[in-house]
UniProtKB/Swiss-Prot annotation:
The gene is OCT1. InterPro entries: M3A_MIP, MetalloPept_cat_dom_sf, Neurolysin/TOP_dom2, Pept_M3A_M3B, Pept_M3A_M3B_dom. This is Mitochondrial intermediate peptidase. PROSITE patterns: ZINC_PROTEASE. Belongs to the peptidase M3 family. It is found in: Mitochondrion matrix.
């Protein structure tokens, strides 16, 4: 396709951009009465009063603009006009491409295709973000409409025989190939493959079917995503006498509503109450009922998933593929469904016995079995149910209540500003990159809580922009995300209108389109005695922020001439590597000690507290890895081979429960949770990528950073051998280079097995 979307958007001269950095770097801020010194970067996230005063000054003294400094984006009408004008520009570019006949035109053909792709991407990626994160519903609706319109045109282009044939002519002409850059040849090969995956050589009627099917999949997939947070019932009824006799705390039952008869408690399926019941109710039947209610989705959601799977079966059959997985895994690192299943099975074989041993304490507790009695893995796995995990884990944790208290204490060493500032310091040490606050113009952001960070390279200056939308907001998406709004690319030769993009300049004077990304999280704030509201991060939230910043660095440092292969526009089963590698930094005590300082005393985070936390992260970690492997196998199962005659009988919930029963380890044979597994749309047939990249990241960490997480040599190695290539270089070659294992360069089943043979993920 002309767009490779990832998991899953002013007037300026060609002179170097004058950075609108707030000139406060180095300025010190007195926090309350503690005497704590902070940097400007830290202050804009931690001091809500200061941020409010800055925002008011911005409103008073800066000029008006649109979202992301795009002057169109001041209203929903402007968004629609931007989409309309971009579509008009795309039509003109497509016509120029169709009429390319001279040698000079053919030499520039791939670059012009990339420009066409960029024109589409800048609308589709923008709308992907707006429909997910904008607080104004009218923007969400306008973005959905523009996305559908542009996505449909993209699918039309993907089946344009004239465009495809001319691209083939270019790639088969030795004289033209001689003058094309490596990037142009790579992009040409990618785009030709995308044409072929779209059934370009089939009859016109079939190509039209492809367009229609792709559009239907996009629409039903978005509906599926939009409904993953909903449970089947708002509450369930449990008999009062059974609940009262269960041994659960009367303080908890006193918080429950009763039905009209007074004979039943109404247990909600949202909030903290059902989670507290799972942790504290000794009655297994009640826990089972509550657990299933929390995991069940409405039948309509299963119907959406079934329809999504059916449409993908029809699409893959139309294109002559055995399965949707076959279709998706072309040109991925894995190469084939067989290799993916082999990787998952290898990982499961390593992990399953370790997971069983982790659950042994629950099995013994349930049976009151003495330590002297041997319990086989199968016996353990047949005894321990998913609704047991929270209850018995809570009993286990309650033996060390001080550890729980220390966990809560720990977060006050990690304000959001502390962590962002620490990330900047880390990036400076390993990559030569810093994050600097930048003043925004009126209308540049979609919420007053959004902070803009300019990404500054020691060698290149301004290399990108990150918009941080990190604080909780009503109606905001619940999952953290990295959105590519605008890709890095060199300015095209005939480009002279920079009003809708932000630009930078390389050290050699080359002008390029700045990569612009948005990081979206939902972190809560607390009120402090001095009247400020500050966000203190739990340790898992720190890991989340590091993960998303890993994606951001990939976007910033993967700076290629052409946007089709810049940053995160790479193989789906490679794209999570930089982000998961960052999780290792977030779990390293040396890094955490550098970042953490108490918000009142400025003392560094105590080593004992951090060690306690890191020890707790190992609790049931193999169960978590195995759970991810089951999800990856479900993804392969739902996108495996189905005959067209069988598609009406596809029942994703039955497939899910049957697979769970066979694979064991906290097997779910009670709920239809698969309807809440949103990645089945965005990562259809490629969810294994998460585990695969975890396994690779573990090996990269051990090779480059385990001995010293601040190692500049290791950072430069990862930057030069992985990050800077974006999607240009074969991922297996990148891995072979960074691990210094040449045999991995050819990929295939043996390489997949090597990666899958990992315990420490």
């Amino acid at each position: 396709m002309l767009i490779q979307k990832i998991l899953l958007n002013k007037e300026i001269s060609r002179l170097p951009r004058i950075l609108s950095i707030l000139n406060y770097t180095g300025l010190r801020w007195l926090s309350g009465s503690s005497g704590r010194n902070t940097t400007e970067l830290q202050r804009i996230f931690d001091d809500s009063k200061y941020w409010q005063s800055l925002s008011e000054n911005t409103t008073q003294y800066t000029k008006e603009t649109g979202l992301f400094k795009n002057p169109y984006l001041t209203s929903t009408d402007g968004l629609r006009q931007f989409s309309h004008d971009s579509l008009h520009k795309a039509h003109k570019l497509a016509e120029i491409l169709r009429n390319s006949v001279s040698k000079e035109e053919k030499v520039h053909y791939i670059m012009n295709l990339d420009q066409l792709s960029d024109t589409l991407c800048r609308v589709i990626d923008l709308c992907e973000f707006l429909r997910s994160a904008h607080p104004d519903q009218s923007y969400v609706e306008a973005a959905q409409m523009c996305h559908e319109e542009m996505f449909e045109f993209m699918n039309v282009l993907n089946t344009d025989v004239v465009l495809c044939n001319k691209l083939k002519e270019v790639l088969e002409d030795p004289e033209i190939l001689k003058v094309l850059s490596e990037e142009e040849r790579k992009v040409g090969e990618i785009l030709l493959d995308d044409f072929e995956k779209s059934g370009i050589y089939m009859k016109a009627g079939i190509r039209e079917q492809f367009i229609e099917l792709s559009q239907q999949i996009s629409v039903i997939g978005q509906e599926f995503i939009n409904n993953t947070d909903y449970v089947a019932k708002e509450f369930i009824k449990v008999k009062r006498d059974e609940m009262d006799k269960s041994g659960i705390s009367p303080l908890l039952t006193a918080r429950l509503n009763r039905d009209l008869t007074g004979k039943y408690y109404k247990i909600p399926t949202y909030g903290q109450i059902p989670l507290q019941i799972l942790k504290s109710c000794p009655d297994e039947d009640i826990r089972k009922e509550v657990w299933a209610a929390l995991h069940n989705c409405p039948k309509a959601q299963i119907q959406r998933l079934n329809q999504l799977v059916r449409l993908r079966v029809i699409l893959s059959n139309l294109l002559g593929k055995q399965s949707y997985s076959d279709y998706q895994l072309d040109n991925k690192m894995a190469g084939s469904p067989e290799n993916v299943k082999g990787f998952i099975k290898t990982l499961m074989n390593v992990t399953k016995p370790l997971a069983a041993r982790e659950l042994e304490f629950i099995a013994r507790d349930k049976l009151n079995a003495p330590d002297s009695r041997h319990m086989s893995d199968n016996e353990i796995l047949s005894i321990v149910k998913p609704w047991d995990k929270n209850y018995f884990s809570s009993k286990y944790d309650s033996d060390n209540e001080m550890a729980m208290i220390r966990d809560e204490q720990l977060r006050y060493y990690f304000s959001l500003g502390n962590v962002i500032n620490g990330l900047s310091e880390l990036f400076k040490r390993i990559y030569g990159i810093t994050l600097q606050p930048s003043r925004t113009e009126n209308g540049e952001t979609w919420s007053p809580d959004v902070r803009r960070l300019d990404v500054i390279s020691e060698e290149e200056g301004l290399v990108g922009v990150i918009y941080c939308d990190l604080f909780e907001r009503v109606g905001k998406i619940s999952n953290p995300a990295h959105f590519t709004v605008c890709c890095s690319r060199q300015v095209y030769p005939d480009e002279n209108d920079f009003t809708t993009i932000q630009t930078g300049q390389n050290s050699d004077g080359t002008v390029f389109q700045l990569p612009v990304i948005s990081l979206v999280c939902n972190f809560s704030t607390v009120a402090l005695p001095n009247g400020n509201r500050t966000c203190f991060l739990h340790m898992n939230e720190i890991e989340t922020l590091f993960h998303e910043m890993g994606h951001a660095m990939h976007s910033m440092l993967g700076r290629t001439r052409l946007q089709n292969i810049s940053g995160t526009r790479c193989a789906t089963d490679f794209v999570e590597l930089p982000s998961i590698l960052m999780e290792h930094f977030a779990r390293d005590i040396r890094v955490l000690r550098t970042i953490g300082s108490h918000y009142e005393t400025s003392e560094p985070a105590p080593e004992a507290l951090l060690n306690d936390y890191l020890d707790k992260t190992q609790f049931l970690q193999h169960c978590e890895t195995y759970s991810q492997a089951k999800m990856a196998m479900l993804d392969q199962k739902l996108h495996g081979s189905f005959s067209l005659s069988d598609i009406e009988r596809i029942d994703s919930a039955k497939i899910y429960q049957k697979l769970e029963t066979r694979l064991q380890v906290l097997a779910d044979d009670e709920s239809n949770w698969c309807g809440r597994f949103g990645h089945l749309f965005g990562y259809g047939a490629t969810y294994y990528s998460y585990l695969f990249d975890r396994a690779i990241a573990s090996k990269v960490w051990d090779s480059l950073f385990k001995d010293d997480p601040f190692n500049r040599t290791g950072g430069e190695k990862f930057k030069e051998r992985v990050l800077k290539w974006g999607g240009l270089k074969n991922p297996w070659s990148c891995i072979a280079d960074v691990l210094e294992k040449p045999d991995l360069a050819k990929g295939g089943a043996e390489a997949m097995t090597y990666i899958g043979d990992s315990e420490d993920l």
